[in-house]
Amino acid sequence: MRHFLLLLGVIAAMAIGAPAYSQYVFMDVNGDGVNTLADVLTSSSTTVHVYFDTNHSKAGATVTCTDGVHPLDMAIYDFVVHASGSGSVTYNGYTQSAVMNAAGFQQLNAFTVSGQNAGVGYIANNYANPGRYELGTISVTITGSPILTFVGTSTDPAIPSFGTGYGTHCDASVNTNEETLGIDFFDADGTRSSTPTESTTWGKIKQLYR
């Protein structure tokens, strides 16, 4: 009984106090500020909104830096996206949001297109507080039914941005003070397929183990 109670205490302590890397980056096509099955690229789509939430997981749980000391604030951001699927994406440019402009973020890595990839990066003199930010919008022209996904670490030498992540006071695990998708956090949603994953056989199986 004593060991059982001790185990419960340990689990409770972990659930309450254990910091985690669970930031969330996502795209929004229809402009409602969230990512859902409705965020599908069609020929009528002209913009894709890009968001970073530095201190919440996809599920909405509050997260903190793993060192328990430094904030998950942001002074630099980069992202790289990749187009795939049935159809094509023409990248026409990137416009940073008014919120990020007001926070003093200025272009660091110009919006660059290389084949199916595109990337951009901005930097500020001061750190934006932890939270959810609309970074900006990508202007696109769509044919068919393509999808856009985030690239964690880019291997495309033509794109100046390293990949998808942000500079912060929190000490990241590989890229110093650079929280990187696929290394330090994994919650990411691009645009959705016109055929929802849930409707396929494999998709139905995956839904059982979410």
Q: Predicted regions: what is each one?
A:
Residues 77-79, 136-138, 205:
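Buried hydrophobic-core signal for structured, non-transmembrane domains
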Residues 24, 74-78, 147:
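Exposed beta-strand and adjacent loop surfaces of beta-rich binding modules
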Residues 34-104, 129:
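Low-complexity, serine/threonine/proline/glycine-rich extracellular segments that form mucin-like
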Residues 7-15:
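Bacterial N-terminal signal peptides
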Residues 148-183:
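Short, surface-exposed beta-strand/loop patches at domain edges
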Residues 19-43, 183-187, 191-210:
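Boundary/junction segments of secreted and surface-exposed precursor proteins
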Residues 100-151:
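Structured beta-strand segments within beta-sheet-rich domains
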Residues 1-5, 210:
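Positively charged n-region of N-terminal signal peptides that target proteins for export
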